[in-house]
């Protein structure tokens, strides 16, 4: 009898808690964006991708280094830069440095602007109060430095109230330029946590991971240039290849290096902005596609198209978030340029000339800028062991990434299952929290879509429309199977309650190749019910 009672109790708990990952007969998984994943899920995604690539023998040249117990990122140096005065602003460059340094410099400049604005407000308040407040500011600065040395390694140096707000909702921003206030501190913290080499994030690192999605980490110069090209350069013939003004490009580059508020408007030349974007990636100290994965990316050129895309997906998962986010932004604009390569008929019926820049032409331009040889690759000959020329392989890889940019940054259902199982093994409570939060988000989105559909559908009378919108056309019966009408904000207003609701109805699994996901990525919803 005791074994039977134990088995019955286990079955009851499984039914109540929703079961372990991989057992979910009532729901179907779908492709999700990597931007909807929490920091913990991103780490588990990297682990799953690493083991999958090792099994496929794509990481033969990759030698991960284990993290030492004393390993920590240069958080002190980053914070000390933020606390420095205006005299060091000129040293915070944008071009010719590592991608992570570009992001940190942008954060530092933003913080300096905030500090200068605060000091000006204090000086305007009066000399008596400004002297006292200046002394308090100095005390706060030394207090921060003291906490950096004496605090625990994994403890975030953030105000308690801001940390609580950060746990309740994720930071969501299209670029670093859109982050406001305390989000700058959280962004710096996330940047310091992910700045380890790929191997150290996978092997031996015991840092605590957040359950919030990672804010997108895209340099301002990349976002500004890509937005300008999308608005003004899609129909420009020979974009990225024709001549440009070196003087104007040098001036723009100096303005970005000086941290000025550069605005790219109609007065700018498209070819100058395109050349500036190329120079940023060409002069970057590291490679946008990490040096450690150089040979692995080249090896994908020997595969069939579908197998190549699957391998490229895994390699993208393995990249640091700042690299993958910047790569996605670049591939998105390059894909739009390639879509406008041929002549077309505009809305007004006039002929619109194409830019003549196919994905192959764009890959020829950006292949060597995105795939740079690392220390290990430089020792190799011009051809890999498989007999493929490095340049030809790089063009093939970049072309495939441009053509399928919207698929590379999605997670297919079978990878979702692996990630969910790894999260379950490390922390069942974390997986339960992520499930409940994602369920509330999806329910809110579904309710909003239903209300939008009701508003868009024609109705016979205004009374019927009002009743349909308010959910009063038919009273809700407690014994019926229908849902009561829920206001749009209801699911978000009960963050501390249990995630309850009707079963989620998801779309059918979609194919791997050429999946449009523009609308789906904007929702930022990750859902792990494999």
Swiss-Prot record:
UniProt key word Repeat: no
GO biological process: one example: signal transduction
Alphabetically ordered keywords of this record: GTPase activation, Signal
Location of region: Disordered: 471-512
Signal peptide bounds: 1-19
Stretches assigned to the Rho-GAP domain: 209-409
Record GO terms (molecular function): GTPase activator activity
Site (Arginine finger): 241
Described purpose of this protein according to its UniProt entry: GTPase activator for the Rho-type GTPases by converting them to an inactive GDP-bound state.
Binding partners and assembly: May interacts (via the Rho-GAP domain) with the active form of RAC1.
Full protein name: Rho GTPase-activating protein 36
The organism of origin for this protein: Bos taurus (Bovine)
Gene: ARHGAP36
């Amino acid at each position: 009898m005791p074994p039977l009672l134990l088995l019955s109790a286990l079955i009851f708990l499984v039914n109540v808690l929703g079961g372990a990952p991989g057992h979910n007969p009532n729901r179907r998984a779908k492709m999700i964006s990597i931007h909807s994943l929490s920091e913990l899920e991103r780490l588990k995604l990297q682990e799953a991708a690493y083991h999958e690539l090792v099994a496929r023998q794509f990481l033969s040249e990759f030698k991960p280094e284990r993290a030492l117990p004393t390993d920590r990122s240069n958080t002190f140096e980053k914070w000390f830069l933020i606390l420095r005065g205006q005299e060091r602003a000129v040293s915070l460059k944008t071009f010719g440095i590592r991608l992570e340094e570009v992001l940190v410099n942008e954060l530092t400049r933003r913080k300096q602007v905030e500090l200068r604005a605060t000091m000006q407000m204090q000086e305007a308040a009066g000399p008596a109060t400004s002297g006292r407040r200046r002394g308090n500011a100095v005390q706060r600065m030394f207090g921060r430095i003291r906490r950096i040395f004496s605090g625990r390694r994994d403890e975030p140096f953030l105000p308690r109230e801001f940390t609580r707000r950060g746990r309740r909702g994720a930071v969501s921003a299209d670029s670093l330029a859109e982050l406001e206030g305390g989000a700058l501190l959280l962004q710096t913290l996330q940047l310091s946590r992910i700045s380890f080499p790929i191997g150290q994030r996978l092997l031996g690192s015991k840092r605590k991971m957040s359950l919030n999605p990672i804010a997108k980490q895209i340099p301002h110069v990349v976002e500004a240039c890509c937005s300008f090209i999308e608005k003004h350069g899609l129909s420009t013939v020979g974009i990225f290849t024709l001549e440009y003004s070196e003087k104007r490009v040098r001036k723009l580059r100096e303005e970005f290096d000086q941290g000025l508020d550069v605005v790219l408007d109609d007065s700018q030349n498209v070819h100058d902005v395109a050349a500036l974007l190329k120079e940023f990636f060409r002069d970057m100290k590291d490679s946008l596609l990490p040096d450690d994965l150089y040979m692995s990316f080249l090896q994908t050129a020997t595969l069939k198209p579908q197998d190549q895309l699957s391998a490229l997906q895994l390699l993208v998962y393995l990249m640091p978030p700042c690299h993958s986010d910047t790569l996605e932004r670049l591939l998105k604009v390059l894909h739009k340029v390639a879509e406008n390569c041929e002549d077309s008929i505009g809305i007004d019926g006039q002929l619109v000339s194409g830019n003549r820049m196919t994905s192959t032409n764009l890959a020829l331009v950006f292949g060597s800028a995105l795939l740079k040889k690392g220390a290990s690759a430089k020792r190799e000959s011009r051809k890999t062991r498989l007999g493929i020329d490095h340049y030809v392989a790089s063009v093939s890889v970049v072309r495939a990434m441009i053509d399928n940019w919207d698929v590379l940054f999605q997670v297919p259902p079978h990878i979702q299952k692996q990630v969910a199982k790894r999260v379950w093994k490390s922390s069942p409570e974390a997986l339960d929290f992520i499930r409940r939060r994602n369920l509330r988000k999806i329910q809110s989105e579904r309710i909003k879509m239903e209300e939008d559909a009701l508003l868009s559908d024609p109705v016979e009378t205004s009374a019927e429309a009002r009743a349909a919108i308010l959910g009063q056309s038919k009273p809700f019966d407690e014994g019926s199977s229908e849902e009561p009408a829920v206001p749009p904000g209801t699911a978000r207003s009960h963050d501390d309650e249990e995630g309850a609701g009707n079963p989620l109805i998801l779309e059918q699994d979609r194919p791997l190749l050429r999946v449009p996901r523009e609308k789906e990525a904007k929702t930022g919803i990750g859902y792990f019910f494999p």
